[in-house]
Amino acid sequence: MRFGRAALLGLSFFLWLSATAWSEPVAVRFPEGVTRAFPAVRSLDGKTLAFGDFVQVAREDRVHSRLLFRFKDGSVHDENVVFSQRGVFRMESYRLIQKGPSFPETLEVALDRQSGVYSVRHRADEDSPEEIVEGKFEVPDDAYNGMLTLILKNLPASTGDTVSMVAFTPKPRVVKLRLTPMADEQVTLNESPMQAARYIVKPELGFFASMLLFDLPSLRCWILPGEAPAFLKAEGPLYFMGPVWRIEPF
């Protein structure tokens, strides 16, 4: 059994034991618009693993966001989110493609809120057949796949929240994420000292899950607060039980 399949089974068990109560969607404090950025994926020792392209555009009443990472080993992480921001942020559709040697398996998922239709295509390795799982799923109002840094920018200063993410095991399941503010950290930008807000994003486990499972990697994010909040960097895995990588501007 390859790690990819073991990871899916482990994630499925973890989600079954997790709390799944829905929360309210996050209020819009800073509306999103046209954005272009070029982040990079690096190991914690500073080695560059992938170059990225982040493109965000507004079309009518929807915002379309795409984050594409091309790894040096040929792997691809391609994440597309469409969301609305009429008073609150709401994920309307989500697509993710992960493939190549940097990932334990090939994965392609698609989820649409309005229709409730989802599709998952995954292959454990080159010698395994592709499996396709399709069906319908009710997307929580507070589900924010591919939107966590945006949500953190919109939290009031020094406050946290609990939101949802849809994980694919391969069937979609809801997992709660706790967004917790930590102590501010001083950072240097353009040779000027500034205070950055640091957050920990961690799955919220039920009692039995917390007793039975090993520690799951958390995501750490640094946000520059103010009248125009900015994402600085994040450290965490790009897939379940994956290595901790750093995402930051190139």
Language-model segments: which ranges?
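Bacterial N-terminal signal peptides
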Residues: 8-18
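Acidic, serine/threonine-rich low-complexity disordered tracts
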Residues: 22-115, 159-250
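Short, intrinsically disordered, low-complexity segments enriched in Ser/Thr and Pro
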Residues: 115-121
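Surface-exposed beta-loop interaction hotspot
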Residues: 121-159
